[in-house]
Amino acid sequence: MSKVLFIVGSLRQGSFNHQLAAQAEKALAGKAEVSYLDYKDVPFFNQDLESPAPAAVAKLREEILAADAIWIFSPVYNWAIPGVVKNLLDWTSRALDLSDPSGPSALKAKVGTVSSVANGTSPDEVFKHYRSLLPFIRMNVVDQFTGVGINPEAWGTGQLVLSEDKLAELSAQADALLAAIN
């Protein structure tokens, strides 16, 4: 069974993007093994710390290397990628052997996709950033992204409610991700 690693770009307890990831996990049930990356202890990227890599970074790299695919669930912060996700991608896109900068990284040739819950109607702005960044760091992107706007009521209830259309879109994205692995 394929292994899909979820990266939730919001560290907030009960985040809407974590709720979206839970729905995606249901879409992958019986088709893939899902795990969630815990990266809250990763330090800010700093070349002075790069070699040897901090233990938290080494652990991240191992988890990413063990996965067949990466699925990022990203909020939109100021129309861009959240800093914690960018930091994670900076660490894990670096060559594993620093004497060979174009050599393999934890993310090189890794299949990946992105979904996002954003305030307002659409996370298109953050998708532009991912569509530029992920190929640059040599990932194989499944460009069938799912975007969900937060309903104003969700801020009061804390609950993300997806329409049948959005659930179908998420399921189709899951199938496309699995097809890209195999």
Where are these regions (language model features)?
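N-terminal beta1-alpha1 ligand-phosphate binding loop
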Residues: 2-31
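Glycine-rich phosphate/pyrophosphate-binding loop and the adjoining helix
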Residues: 5, 140-182
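A generic structural motif
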Residues: 29-35, 139
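A structural preference for short, hydrophobic beta-strand core positions in alpha/beta folds
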Residues: 35-38, 143
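N-terminal beta-loop-helix "entrance" segment that forms/cooperates
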Residues: 39-55, 154-159
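Helix-loop-strand module that forms the ligand-binding subsite of alpha/beta enzymes
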Residues: 53-137
